[in-house]
């Protein structure tokens, strides 16, 4: 595992040096977060077992003809569905366990919602990568055992990242490393036989694919999830802590947005475009909530202009949470979003709307227009507080009339009390929220404050007050926005750089096996020139020179001279090696690039145990409505993320099947765009 800078030429990877290995958290440490993640992993296994049982029972019910057997299967199926519902509720309880992720400092604040990390299974890269190194690169695969072990160690460390910037760098370094691995070992025309399995963070349903893009997308999701955990951990009683929380949630939104735009068809609910859009909105809403807390942190002075600003800031938070709750209530997100999340979002929407009306009431009731006050400025602020004044009222007349100010202020208090009552009611309807004591305390204190304020100014003729408080225009001094991930700031060394420069020695290109060329320089003349950077190519080859007669060809890449690896050497360095050879001649190994084979997407085998239709499945099902019945029958047999047909698939070659000299691979028509490459923001499919 490494996080070192990429040198100009490959250097020995010093494992003893500081910073080479970047480890995750101790998986055996009994912290609150690790216990929660272990419970999530155990629940995922139980959900997998239950889903398999349900799938088997449904299949048996389809083929069974005996009446008693069918009745027994229906009974068992009802039990399995009941178990699945209970497991889903347990997983929802883990997703709303916000107390574990909050700051250790005691704070009287509304809790924030973090995302849990996606769980995965162990993967053994060694056999597949060793076979490919021998088959494709014609090198001794045992020379790369340490590099393969480093890759597997890095992946294992990413399962338990630390909840800080080092943990984010760890995940990002693995994501970048996956780009190197994809280019080196995953040709677009075949599958490598490595099954990647990841569990849905929201439903616990496992999804498996023989495709590295599932791994990359899941790592991106975990980067966003880790940012949310960092944001909830920040101390919200300090200015620096709130700044860190705002930044973390904006970065989480940026990572999830990048995931949505890059991986457009994903086989799990938590990474579907609709769900990711909602999660991005949720992160931005929580960032906006922290902006409001930053304004209130020094204390809210009971001044007219300060109260106008705070009221509009609170209205902004309430507005974004109201929009988020509307998005959560739409299909297909509604069926899979945790109910406790939607309830908490609804509670916050009413809570901050109530605060906005409370501050508006305070500025109207507690402040009178005094002689010498900035009358024009107050009139302008009051007119900008509403999109329209209540019927029969004008800003200036309201400011000058104490009776109108009190009547309008009390109407704001009535709306504030109504919103508080609704937030308390919503919180009481959700069992998970009832167990969050700090949330209940915040809601009850705010409700009591508004109720007492109204009771102080309540008159007997309030029933005759027909003024209806208008909505408050939302406004903020700091509009939150997504911060896209900056992978360029976290560079990593390619573990397999000994294979050669990635621009030439990649899985997309094929060469002849290395050929030994033994020749002598006649009177210091090699018979050819050199060109290129790394690796160096044979250029302007004299067909009658000793090298050409020994088998060298125009355009050959020089990979070694006198058993010295030359794949990373420049022209001047290779020329020094050639001139240093004595009278015994030059022993040189070269490879020839075969005809370029156009890349074609491999057919992606998706395995999802009894998973219901995802967002992507629903979209593709709609696209198929206009097709014929015959086409529909054929399409059902294929993966919904298929690339190409069976006849275009290239059978995986054996370890002993080395590329033959001079035999070019047939041209394959390119049907789809190239798959997602490293740091490429273009849209792509699995």
Swiss-Prot record:
Task: Give all residue intervals belonging to the PDZ domain.
Answer: 515-593
| Entry's localization field | Cytoplasm, Perinuclear region
Where does the REM-1 domain start and stop, copy by copy? 26-100
Which residue positions does Phosphothreonine occur at?
A: 655
Q: Does the keyword Cytoplasm apply?
A: yes
Q: Which SUPFAM superfamilies match?
A: HR1 repeat (SSF46585), PDZ domain-like (SSF50156)
Q: SMART domains, per this entry? A: BRO1, Hr1, PDZ
Q: What is the annotated role of this protein in its UniProt record?
A: Binds specifically to GTP-Rho. May function in a Rho pathway to limit stress fiber formation and/or increase the turnover of F-actin structures in the absence of high levels of RhoA activity.
Q: What is this protein called?
A: Rhophilin-2
Please report the organism this UniProt entry assigns to the protein. Canis lupus familiaris (Dog)
């Amino acid at each position: 595992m490494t996080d070192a800078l990429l040198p100009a030429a490959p250097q020995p990877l010093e494992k003893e040096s500081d910073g080479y290995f970047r480890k995750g958290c101790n998986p055996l440490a009994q912290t609150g977060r690790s216990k929660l993640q272990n419970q999530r992993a155990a629940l995922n296994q139980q959900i997998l077992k239950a889903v398999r049982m349900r799938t088997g029972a449904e299949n048996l019910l389809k083929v069974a003809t005996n009446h008693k057997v069918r009745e027994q299967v229906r009974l068992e199926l009802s039990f399995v569905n009941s178990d699945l519902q209970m497991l889903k509720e347990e997983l929802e309880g883990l997703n709303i366990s916000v107390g574990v992720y909050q700051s250790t400092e005691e704070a009287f604040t509304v809790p924030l919602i973090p995302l849990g990390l996606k769980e995965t299974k162990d993967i053994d890269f060694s056999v597949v990568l060793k076979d490919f190194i021998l088959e494709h690169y014609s090198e001794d695969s045992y020379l790369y055992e340490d590099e393969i072990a480093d890759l597997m160690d890095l992946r294992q460390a990413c399962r338990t990242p630390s909840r800080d910037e080092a943990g984010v760098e760890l995940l990002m370094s693995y994501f970048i490393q996956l780009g190197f691995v994809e280019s080196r070992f995953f040709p677009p025309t075949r599958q490598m036989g490595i099954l990647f399995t990841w569990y849905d963070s929201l439903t616990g349903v496992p999804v498996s694919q023989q495709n590295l893009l599932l791994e990359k997308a899941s790592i991106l999701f975990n980067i966003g999830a880790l940012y949310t955990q960092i944001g909830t951990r920040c101390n919200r009683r300090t200015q620096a802590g709130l700044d860190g929380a705002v930044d973390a949630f904006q970065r989480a939104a940026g990572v999830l947005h990048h995931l949505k735009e890059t991986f457009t068809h994903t086989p799990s609910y938590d990474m579907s475009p609709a769900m990711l859009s909602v999660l991005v909105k949720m992160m931005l809403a929580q960032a906006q909530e922290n902006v409001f807390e930053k304004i209130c942190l020094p204390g809210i002075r009971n001044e007219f202009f300060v109260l106008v600003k705070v009221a509009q800031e609170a209205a902004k938070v309430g507005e974004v949470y109201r929009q988020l709750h509307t998005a959560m209530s739409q299909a297909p997100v509604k069926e899979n979003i945790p109910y406790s999340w939607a309830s908490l979002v609804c509670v916050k929407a009413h809570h901050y709307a109530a605060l906005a009306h409370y501050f508006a009431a305070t500025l109207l009731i507690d402040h009178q227009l005094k002689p010498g006050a900035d009358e024009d400025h107050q009139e302008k602020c009051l007119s900008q507080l509403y999109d329209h004044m209540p019927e029969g009222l004008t800003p200036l007349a309201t400011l000058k009339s104490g009776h109108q100010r009190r009547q309008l202020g009390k109407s704001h208090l009535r709306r504030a009390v109504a919103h508080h009552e609704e937030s308390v009611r919503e919180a009481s309807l959700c069992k998970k929220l009832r167990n969050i004591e700090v949330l209940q305390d915040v809601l009850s204190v705010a409700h009591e404050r508004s109720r007492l304020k109204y009771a102080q100014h309540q008159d007997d003729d309030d029933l005759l007050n027909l003024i209806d408080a208008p909505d408050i225009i939302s406004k903020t001094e700091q509009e939150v926005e997504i911060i896209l991930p900056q992978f360029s700031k976290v560079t990593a060394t390619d573990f397999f750089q000994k294979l050669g420069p990635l621009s030439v020695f990649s899985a997309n290109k094929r060469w002849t096996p290395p050929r030994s060329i033994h020749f002598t320089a006649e009177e210091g003349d090699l018979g050819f020139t050199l060109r290129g950077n790394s690796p160096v190519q044979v250029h302007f080859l004299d067909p009658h020179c000793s090298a050409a007669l020994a088998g060298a060809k125009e355009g050959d890449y020089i990979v070694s001279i006198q058993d010295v690896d030359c794949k990373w050497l420049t022209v001047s360095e290779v020329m020094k090696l050639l001139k240093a050879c004595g009278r015994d001649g030059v022993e040189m190994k070269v490879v020839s690039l075969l005809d370029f084979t156009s890349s074609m997407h491999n057919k992606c085998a998706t395995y999802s145990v009894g998973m219901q239709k995802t967002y992507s499945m629903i979209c593709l099902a709609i696209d198929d409505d206009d097709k014929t019945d015959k086409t529909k029958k054929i399409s059902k047999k294929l993966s919904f993320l298929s690339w190409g047909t069976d006849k275009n698939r290239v059978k995986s070659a054996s370890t002993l099947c080395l590329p033959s000299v001079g035999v070019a691979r047939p041209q394959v028509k390119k049907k789809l765009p190239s798959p997602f490459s490293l740091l490429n923001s273009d849209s792509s499919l699995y």
